[in-house]
Amino acid sequence: MSTNQETRGFQSEVKQLLQLMIHSLYSNKEIFLRELISNASDAADKLRFKALSNPDLYAGDGELRVCISFDSEKGTLTVSDNGIGMTREQVIDHLGTIAKSGTKEFLAALGSDQAKDSQLIGQFGVGFYSAFIVADKVTVKTRAAGEPADKGVLWESAGEGDYTVADIEKKSRGTDVILHLRDDEKEFLNEWRLRGIIGKYSDHIGLPVEMLTKEYEDEGKEIGEKWEKINKSDALWTRSKNEISDEEYKEFYKHLSHDFADPLLWAHNKVEGNQEYTSLLYVPSKAPWDLFNREHKHGLKLYVQRVFIMDDAEQFMPNYLRFMRGLIDSNDLPLNVSREILQDNKVTAALRKALTKRSLQMLEKLAKDDAEKYQQFWKEFGLVLKEGPAEDFANKEAIAKLLRFASTHNDSSEQNVSLEDYVSRMKEGQKAIYYITADSYVAARNSPHLELFNKKGIEVLLLSDRIDEWMLSYLTEFDGKPLQSITKADLDLGDLADKEAEEQKAQDESFGSFVERVKTLLGGRVKEVRLTHRLTDTPAVVSTDNDQMTTQMAKLFAAAGQPVPEVKYTFELNPEHHLVKKVAEIADEAQFADWVELLLEQAMLAERGSLENPAAFIKRINKLLG
């Protein structure tokens, strides 16, 4: 009998997610059972952990398991566990809301493309709600460990606008999820269908999955029912690598991550010696939708001596590897370990160092063995990996080898050029790795700063991700060669510079008075005015000194709401350009001023992508064209 019954409305995001999920995941509907068994496994893990400090929570029932049964007459399928259970407050929190930041933004990003919806929902992790793919009503009966029998809770919903919650009496600890199957989903009331799903998705979890099966005499006569263990229930990571198939590794990844897609690669290692631990690391094939959300949880599952301790133990991976999934099972940490203890622990630091190295080696091997697959990884996680040089000085060279860039070597915006590729193609006498940063690939590819490099056939890296400028403030060299921006006023090409130095010097002298006129006109608005011979088709550019903040870095500061120091540019004029020659000959000061201003505005527009006063620029063009 139930008491204290109330009907509550779903959080709006739950309603939207339920509708999307029912339609988008229908083609792979059997995953609901995998999700419910995974939740039951998590509940058992949490009870084991709490019972370390309070063994009485077991209350004489320490053999944890998942039980599956069905009733053909009633059309119900039940998934039960004797794990941690839930209180009334926890039921409302966990089953009536989605406690994830950015949920609204995630749902807004979903379109009408079912394949895309399915992929994104899979990344989100649907868990319990997947029951509504096959059920038109779901009933949950639960009782939290340590609570008396009269503290059971009933939750029930048809997956529409609301749900009912009430107090009930429940004799046993744990949770029963009862699915009232739709008329066209009765295939899941079949013992062999269920055996197949359990074998496919849940063979690897370290918890027995039992099913109520019919028992027969030798003559084939039914004599009753019995609970039969269906899965192997050996924790997969404790088995020898030679015994585990690729399919088992893939399904275990889906169990761990609640991802629907196969992982890109994995590494399973058992380490003995000064430290004893087993790690199973996965690289996902798709980035989670909230990878760049600051509240996004990441990290490995932590086990100590095969006992689950915590999810999302971020202390074992640096932030730039937050996309890695998997687990670590350590013999060297205490069973009562907490997040606080992990923060300042020598064992943790040693494990973090080893797991970071292992992860980078996985990526290095992938890049070497399968460039196409590595490009798939780079498109999903390249931006995150670019955070590495700033975070991890010890592994900076290893990270640098994994970075990929667009380049003038290819007529493509695809980031597929490594620094090793670049160095192998450097010109004789070239001492630096040259790059340019811009708001977009198109802006970088068409920058006037490239003109001399194109003329001389010198490769330039084209960087257009917002993080690039910040990354390069930490990644200043590779293989002993400095990385140098081609937009700097004091750029020195060394042995690659033009040989016509005498001719250029004479030309510069003939333009001396012109340069002085421009300096007088512009005054303190620019740092310096000078002639340049690194342009071929463009009359003028602006550039910054080595000790100055670059344009892209200034934009990065502004976007982050940080104060931006004033950037004073060097104004460089091309004495070989017909327009500069024409302006140098203008005697009328007003007309001269208009043309110089126009040249400066053009250069600023090419460098920054915008002007402080675009109306004045347009007015000036109209005036000079009229």
Curated annotation (Swiss-Prot):
Keywords: ATP-binding, Chaperone, Cytoplasm, Nucleotide-binding, Stress response. It comes from Aggregatibacter actinomycetemcomitans. PANTHER family: HEAT SHOCK PROTEIN 90 FAMILY MEMBER (PTHR11528). Homodimer. Its main location: cytoplasm. HAMAP family: HSP90. Residues 1-339 are annotated as: A. Belongs to the heat shock protein 90 family. One of its GO terms (cellular component) is cytoplasm. Residues 340-555 are annotated as: B. One of its GO terms (molecular function) is ATP binding. CDD domains: HATPase_Hsp90-like (cd16927). Molecular chaperone. Has ATPase activity. It comes from the Bacteria. This is Chaperone protein HtpG. Residues 556-626 are annotated as: C. The gene is htpG. The keyword Ribonucleoprotein does not apply. It is found in: Cytoplasm.
